[in-house]
A protein has these predicted regions:
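Internal glycine-rich alpha/beta core junctions
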Residues: 1-207
Length: 207
């Protein structure tokens, strides 16, 4: 195919929609190629250069995916922190055990809830530090002095897969902990934390 117009439709057919766990605000489709005679493909760029160009694009996308995972983790942390400050459960401990004469305390004063909140905070702040460092390396690789730029590019090449994979795994764990802090409410659509988990689950899969 030389790119000239023939008046005929290319044999690419929209076969249906994929019904996803998360990211329901974006459409994801299934395409069939060449089932009725053959689809025509067009070369973009030079022969043998496609994979190199794709990886150049994907390396930038990986940092973006890691940042997206981090922000979803942070959103869950902020939601569960606010909930833990507001949700009363249990009585304060006195010398003889729980003091039934005292008002209930917010669950943020429970040791296990504190643990889950601090774990979320640690995962998300660590992930954010990594993403911002990679963003700085991108700038330095493009604008630094030749030796500094080369060193930044080399370090970025090593860190980019980590900047994608680590936040997408551990900020998803943060989202799971955010659901746990909410208890049964976290499993309902009345609170946003279940959606944060569903949306963040994709970041371990896609790029």
């Amino acid at each position: 195919a030389d790119g000239s117009l023939t008046g005929q439709r290319n044999d690419v057919v929209l076969a249906g929609l994929n019904h996803k766990c998360g990211w329901r605000g974006t459409t994801n489709t299934l395409l069939n190629f060449g089932e009725c005679g053959g689809a025509v493909g067009y070369l973009v760029g030079k022969h043998g250069e496609g994979l190199r160009c794709m990886f150049h694009m994907m390396n930038e996308a990986r940092i973006g995916v890691g940042m997206g995972a981090t922000m979803l983790g942070y959103a869950g942390y902020e939601a569960s922190l606010a909930y833990a400050k507001d949700r009363p459960q249990g009585r304060p401990m006195g010398q003889g055990g729980k003091d039934a004469t005292q008002p209930q305390i917010p669950i943020i004063r429970h040791a296990d809830v504190k643990r889950m909140l601090l774990a979320q905070k640690s995962y998300c702040e660590g992930a954010l530090a990594l993403e911002l460092y990679c963003a700085r390396l991108v700038d330095e690789a493009h604008t630094g002095a030749p030796d500094d730029a080369a060193q930044a590019a080399l370090l970025l090449e090593m860190l980019t897969p980590i900047a994608k994979s680590w936040p997408s795994e551990w900020c998803l764990e943060a989202n799971s902990l955010a659901i746990q802090v909410h208890g049964g409410y976290g499993y309902t659509r009345d609170f946003p934390v279940e959606q944060y988990w569903r949306d963040n689950r994709l970041n371990m899969i896609h790029e």
